[in-house]
Amino acid sequence: VKQTPNSQDKLIVLRDRDMSRPLPTRPFRKLKYHKITIETPETPETRRMAENLYRYNEFITQHCIAFDLPDSALVTIAKAMAGNEDKYKLKHIDFSMVQLRRIFSRGDMSLHGRFYGGWWQSINSKDWEYRTHITIDGHRTCEVDYSSVCLRIVYALKGISIDPEEDLYDIGLPGKYSRSKRDLVKEHINAIMNDEEETFSLEKVQLRQLGLTHEELQTLVLKRHKPIREELIAGIGLKTQFIDSQIAEDIMLTMVDKGILVLPVHDSFIVKDKHQRLLETVMLESFKKYTGHPGSLDTTLPRLPCHFGYSKEHYKNLFD
């Protein structure tokens, strides 16, 4: 049954924090507060945003987004989702949830602004391999991700170009550099960018895995990113997310103009695998358009090429 898009007046949401109602958090976690929805200002810009999103939501109703997974895998995902303590996260997969909204934060239309509401976004990044089983109109998909997008945006705001091949999460850790250690550095950096109160710390078991104290890790991060040190500790995260939401809107509408559906997962996009190369081109162009500097991408292949061990270049060449 084809859905009717949500009315435009419900698509742009502005939230703020109720500072009198802090949420309970574990020690050394970022402080959180109850969120309240406030009135979205009626301006030409918010009307434009709503019109653009309504157009995307109307387009997505013409397509079928599904999971090509056995029931046992769906049960595993459902159990993981049911245990999520965040009340703003889905507790189960509802395949009818394909209508998106843009949510802004801190009562400011220039902070945050990412797209939410699609069921595919509820698949935790730790379970990313399940997203390789998402299909669009029965076709296999791939996911193209911006690499270290928020850090690259901060550098761009300072007018500094970064080599697309440079790993911004490599901070010179002692010992062998591994994917698991890189993920912890990424978690730390992304957290401090959204932690104005400077209360965040990785858990003790995570710090032991890195072989560092919180202070030693922070010192390495700030030394590695000395040109943007002040921005990192000032909690610039919501500002960078607004810029990446502008980039996302541009990508979504560009692909709609081409008759191609992309599914946003904040700073990555899912598309039919035959459109991978086109999406990569559009993503790099949009990043340059909004930042003035080159971006960097990472692509997750569909499950079949992964199974046969194809390299990304080999897989791309299958379509040439």
Specify the residue positions occupied by each region the protein language model found.
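Adenine-nucleotide phosphate-binding core of ATP-dependent small-molecule kinases
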Residues: 230-247
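Active-site palm subdomain of RNA-directed nucleic acid polymerases
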Residues: 246-265
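A generic structural motif
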Residues: 165-176, 266, 293-304
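Helical catalytic core of nucleic-acid polymerases
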Residues: 117-235
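Catalytic palm active-site di-aspartate
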Residues: 145-146, 189, 261-272
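A short acidic (Asp/Glu
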Residues: 150-156, 273-282
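C-terminal polymerase-core module
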Residues: 196-201, 276-320
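Non-catalytic nucleic-acid-binding interfaces of large nucleic-acid enzymes and RNP effectors
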Residues: 1-130, 139, 296-320
